């Protein structure tokens, strides 16, 4: 597969995730708010994901279409958030499994197209700082994706997404200095 095809796959996958986000917002948000009544914790858990649903994918997709690195960072954070939120808040259904597969497809195509392969490998010629950042980034991502949705309250997911985004941005700056 060439990079142009991978870029197009990324656009299609991100657009599909935006459609999924809008669908989830239209279907589940009124149910969550109605069931919350006066419980502020439930209202917070309902509001935070849906705010990100309308801001992050639109901004990320626009940046991605303009081939800006910030688009990848924003979309990757959104994809991780949506995957975790789908599993944590709604549970595994056929619809959510399709959403997770779309997330994986998007991330794979975006990473292959926009980032040099050396940034995600442990090459002998890489500096110890590069290898340490690679290890830290993958460890945070794996812990967040696998353990985060099970152990953490929904309000902390945003903080972890922020940490992941920060790591990705820092990793990008280190890579640009080469």
Which residue ranges define each predicted feature?
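Topology signature of small-to-medium multi-pass alpha-helical membrane proteins
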Residues: 1-178
């Amino acid at each position: 597969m060439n990079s142009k095809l991978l870029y197009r796959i990324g656009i299609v996958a991100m657009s599909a995730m935006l459609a999924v986000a809008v669908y989830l917002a239209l279907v589940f948000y009124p149910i969550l708010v109605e069931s919350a009544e006066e419980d502020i914790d439930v209202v917070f858990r309902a509001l935070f994901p849906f705010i990100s649903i309308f801001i992050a994918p639109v901004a990320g997709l626009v940046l991605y279409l303009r081939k800006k690195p910030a688009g990848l960072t924003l979309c990757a954070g959104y994809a991780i958030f949506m995957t975790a939120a789908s599993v944590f808040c709604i549970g595994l259904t056929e619809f959510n499994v399709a959403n997770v597969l779309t997330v994986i497809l998007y991330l794979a195509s975006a990473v292959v197209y926009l980032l040099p392969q050396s940034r995600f490998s442990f090459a002998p010629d890489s500096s110890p700082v590069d290898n340490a950042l690679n290890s830290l980034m993958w460890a945070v991502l794996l812990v967040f994706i696998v353990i985060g949705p099970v152990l953490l309250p929904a309000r902390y997911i945003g903080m972890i997404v922020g940490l992941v985004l920060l790591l990705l941005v820092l990793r990008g700056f280190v890579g640009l200095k080469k």
